[in-house]
Amino acid sequence: NVKKIFRQFETPPDPELIKGFLGSEMCYVISHGDNDGNLLETAAALDELYLNNMAYMLISSNGETAYLEAENEYSRHRAYFLKG
C-alpha cells in the first residue's frame, strides 16, 4: 500500500506524524548522507535529512512501514507513506 501525502516542503516534516505512521521512535535511514543504513531516533534523522535537502527513506525498526521523500526530474518534491 502506498499513500501519497501533501506536505509543504518549505518547512520541516512533522516528526510526530511520521513517528505515528512508522509506529516506532527509531528508524533506519536510507540516504546519501553520513547516516545511510544507521538506526536513529526518528526526530533526529528528520532534522538532519531536512537540512541536507536530499531524497531519503525512513524505515520503521520492524521493517513494516516506510516514509519516502523524493524529488522528480522537475525538482518537484513528493512524499509517500509505504506499508508492507
Residue positions per predicted region:
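Structured alpha/beta or helical-core interaction and ligand-binding surfaces enriched in interleaved
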Residues: 1-75, 80-84
